[in-house]
């Protein structure tokens, strides 16, 4: 290998030409040298190539039953929604693995792969607040190990107006994939509060609806599949900035909303809508059950435009959580609220216990508030706040017991000291 210098005879890297003094390490081979910087660069090139090969087509796609069983471990109730989502997600990723996903624009050009082209099936999730819509989507993404992003439709406006462009939704997905665009192109985007961008009136208006119908129009292309230009730093586009190009053809969109008032539209269509004393009693008790009978024309009347509805072929619903379901949510799932707080108390070396009656009262209070499962955490925080404030300053407490009176009457919880526990153990021994 070439040597330079008159007195020191410095060796050079055969690839980049840097001398041994310019690098940290120079490794010798038969007649060649390579520096640590070139080795690191080679590793990066190999990792990029391996990442391209190890795309979604190489991972084992769980069957609908397996996806459903996984959802069962974390989500209480909502059986129809879990089944629909399991099938829809399985079909979506099976379509990608089979290589039937067309490139953007091929639908318009009439290009077919193997004579049969499988279209993408985005999902519309309808149901009251606090019933697990977002949690269902998050759990799905965790099972599939794909990038997942949550967006709020209320922040979106049509391009050129104050607010977020729809492309910012795609930026969140790219960020969730650590800026790996290939990985992001097979991720899941969950858009919440989609009912808030409904048309302000059923009939088209001469005034521009930039946060309603305008947003629906702007979402059409990315829902269907297009190559979108995304500003890497978010915000508005301007002509002199660079963009990230992302193909949304294989991105699964799950859009969700409470659609308050939709049950009245469904009732009017089906002829079950009564007035005053004529209203059927079972309808008064649980209007959300009628969500299961939703038809595209009901969504059109609610304020979604036909083109938007057409890009959401899978429509599934969730229903209000009843008392037994709320009690189960507190204690049964893997990430049950009681288990979460017990783990938090364990970090301070304290055992947290709940009476069954205490869980009943918490569920009853959540029902009264009408906020579904979200109300459970708020109530738990209110109940445990005084204990969580004092407990870290005390090292004599072994366990804390929450009873029904603690929840209902704000009574102090039962605190059992370490010496009491030790005495009980000695007696039992």
UniProtKB/Swiss-Prot annotation:
Q: Does the keyword Nucleotide-binding apply?
A: yes
- Swiss-Prot/TrEMBL keywords: ATP-binding, Chaperone, Metal-binding, Nucleotide-binding, Zinc
A single GO BP annotation from the record? proteolysis involved in protein catabolic process
Query: What positions does the domain ClpX-type ZB occupy?
Result: 1-54
Record-linked Pfam families: AAA_2, ClpB_D2-small, zf-C4_ClpX
- Quote one Gene Ontology molecular function term: unfolded protein binding
Q: Which GO terms describe its cellular component?
A: HslUV protease complex
> Record-annotated residues binding Zn(2+)?
13, 16, 35, 38
InterPro entries, sorted: AAA+_ATPase, ATP-dep_Clp_protease_ClpX, ATPase_AAA_core, Clp_ATPase_C, Clp_protease_ATP-bd_su_ClpX, ClpX_bact, P-loop_NTPase, Znf_CppX_C4
Top-level taxon:
Bacteria
Q: Which positions in this protein are listed as binding ATP?
A: 128-135
Matching Gene3D superfamilies: 1.10.8.60, ClpX chaperone, C4-type zinc finger domain, P-loop containing nucleotide triphosphate hydrolases
The yes or no answer to whether the keyword Metal-binding is present is yes
Q: Which NCBIfam families match?
A: clpX (TIGR00382), PRK05342.1 (NF003745)
Family per record:
Belongs to the ClpX chaperone family.
* Functional note: ATP-dependent specificity component of the Clp protease. It directs the protease to specific substrates. Can perform chaperone functions in the absence of ClpP.
Task: Report quaternary structure and partners.
Answer: Component of the ClpX-ClpP complex. Forms a hexameric ring that, in the presence of ATP, binds to fourteen ClpP subunits assembled into a disk-like structure with a central cavity, resembling the structure of eukaryotic proteasomes.
Which HAMAP family does the protein's record reference?
ClpX
The identity of this protein, by name, is ATP-dependent Clp protease ATP-binding subunit ClpX
Phylogenetic placement of the source organism = Bacteria, Bacillati, Actinomycetota, Actinomycetes, Micrococcales
